[in-house]
Amino acid sequence: METMASPGKDNYRMKSYKNNALNPEEMRRRREEEGIQLRKQKREQQLFKRRNVELINEEAAMFDSLLMDSYVSSTTGESVITREMVEMLFSDDPDLQLATTQKFRKLLSKEPSPPIDEVINTPGVVDRFVEFLKRNENCTLQFEAAWALTNIASGTSQQTKIVIEAGAVPIFIELLNSDFEDVQEQAVWALGNIAGDSSVCRDYVLNCSILNPLLTLLTKSTRLTMTRNAVWALSNLCRGKNPPPEFAKVSPCLPVLSRLLFSSDSDLLADACWALSYLSDGPNEKIQAVIDSGVCRRLVELLMHNDNKVASPALRAVGNIVTGDDIQTQVILNCSALPCLLHLLSSSKESIRKEACWTISNITAGNRAQIQAVIDANIFPVLIEILQKAEFRTRKEAAWAITNATSGGTPEQIRYLVSLGCIKPLCDLLTVMDSKIVQVALNGLENILRLGEQEGKRSGSGVNPYCGLIEEAYGLDKIEFLQSHENQEIYQKAFDLIEHYFGVEDDDSSLAPQVDETQQQFIFQQPEAPMEGFQL
């Protein structure tokens, strides 16, 4: 990601940081690592595969109950697929072909466990369905065969592979140009299921040249269900990190996604935002392409959407964009993102609060004007409250946001953070078991102590005003304990801080602390301050 940042910018940033241990490269690398971790998490809002399960009307109920009776009997070893069904499927009579394909489709639409394996293990059946896809003179047969194959492809990777190996994908792509909307929509659905299976399947579908016909369909369609399915399929084509899709093969969808962001349909908006979040997840060149498509202002507006399934992927996309360079980050700030992010910090959903903190941490890793913008938006008081009270995974992100600001901020900006009370919650993080966050907290405290040392020299008193605040927060005891930490960087940093800023070590200051497993941190006996106060 560093390649897009100008050398001049990096040199300026290096000089402006008070803490060379947390330089711009480290912060940028951290954003990548954190981003990967966030994107590995399971998303309940979006399914990568969808089965088409019909809503049964009364007229079909009797036939379906008979089918289900035969299906239930198959659990005793009797096959649900009869020899007669297979013979009728291979009949030359179009009416028999249609009726039997419909029977198979109904079986494959049953919840909760359709007999997919039995269907694909019956010789010739899947190939016959694929053959029926080519019957342009019989759109109903095409539709039923496409539906059956869609539900087979909604299963396991092995089941999806059977559909691919039968040669269905190029034919499904041709059917995107069908004159019949039902056939088009079912083809889109099948292709979405196949692309959603794995990066290998996704790339195969892309290499079969799906994008142009899919985008044409998206541009022309006036049917909401069709557009929803097409955007969902498109998001599956953009999804994945190991490896990501070839950007040149998916980036032509950006203008269409830009237009779709103005839909009023929540399902459609959610998948369009997920697609943009995937496309913006990567190096600065990808981020720039997303910015150039003109989506930023609308993405920021969607942060305030009343449906979390839209706000969440919009936040992910905005968060990815601000992992870029300072100029790219500024584009988001110029869209008035900070008031929206402040609003999201009080979301009822913990995952949204966490990602809002993560996004802000990438903004505070920017330049001093960007840190000031976060200050002016009154975000830091809320971040410090989160740092004290939230779930640990959210506290971690808030810690990054505050430490990044102490690393790149001006003396006045750091003093502002101290005035808000950032020292105590940073000291509290010194007892957690996550070594990376202990280092983040130590770096933040070191930046504050370094400023205090400069202020002591400037005032002529030689007294660092922040040493006392850290001692009052029992930070010194915790730093002393960290001198025996198993992580070399942590114990070295703790030793250096005590030696440089606190002078004499107090050997009796701490006994080995207990461990609180539920809070993922160590427990200290808090010593009472001596009557005359702490010695500086």
Swiss-Prot record:
Residues 1-60 form the IBB domain. The keyword Repeat applies. GO terms for biological process: entry of viral genome into host nucleus through nuclear pore complex via importin; NLS-bearing protein import into nucleus; positive regulation of viral life cycle. One of its GO terms (molecular function) is nuclear localization sequence binding. The modification N-acetylmethionine is found at residue 1. It comes from the Eukaryota. SUPFAM superfamilies: ARM repeat (SSF48371). The keyword Repeat applies. The modification Phosphoserine is found at residues 6, 113. Forms a complex with importin subunit beta-1. Interacts with ZIC3. Functions in nuclear protein import as an adapter protein for nuclear receptor KPNB1. Binds specifically and directly to substrates containing either a simple or bipartite NLS motif. Docking of the importin/substrate complex to the nuclear pore complex (NPC) is mediated by KPNB1 through binding to nucleoporin FxFG repeats and the complex is subsequently translocated through the pore by an energy requiring, Ran-dependent mechanism. Belongs to the importin alpha family. This is Importin subunit alpha-7. It comes from Bos taurus (Bovine). The gene is KPNA6.
